[in-house]
C-alpha cells in the first residue's frame, strides 16, 4: 500500500496560476480603458474651434498664474513661458 501524495502543493500551484492570470487580465482591462479615454479626448481635441484656431489638446498644457491667496492681487507675477518656449528649450 503506497502512500498518496498530498494534494496541497497542486492546489496551491493552481491557485497561484489563477491569481497571476487574474492580475494580468485586470491590468489588460485597465490599460484598454485608459487607452479608450485618451482616444476620446484626442478625437475631441482634433475638432477645430469656431474661431478657426486649433482645438483643445490634452497633450499640451498651458499655465497661467492668476491672483491667489498666496500671491495676492498686489504682488504681480512674472510672465510664465509659453508652451512654444518649452518645446524650443527641449
From Swiss-Prot:
Residue intervals annotated with topology Cytoplasmic: 40-90
Organism of this sequence: Homo sapiens
Disulfide cysteine pairs (residue numbers): none
Subunit structure: Interacts with components of the lysosomal V-ATPase complex. Interacts with ATP6V0A1. Interacts with ATP6V0A2.
Any single Gene Ontology cellular-component annotation: late endosome membrane
Membrane topology: Single-pass membrane protein
Record topological domains on the Lumenal side: 1-18
Subcellular location: Late endosome membrane; Lysosome membrane
Annotated tissue distribution: Highly expressed in lung, heart and skeletal muscle.
Bilayer-crossing regions: 19-39
Keywords: Endosome, Lysosome, Membrane, Transmembrane, Transmembrane helix
GO terms classed as biological process: cellular response to amino acid stimulus; negative regulation of TORC1 signaling; regulation of skeletal muscle tissue regeneration
Full protein name: Small regulatory polypeptide of amino acid response
Pfam families associated with the record: SPAR (PF22004)
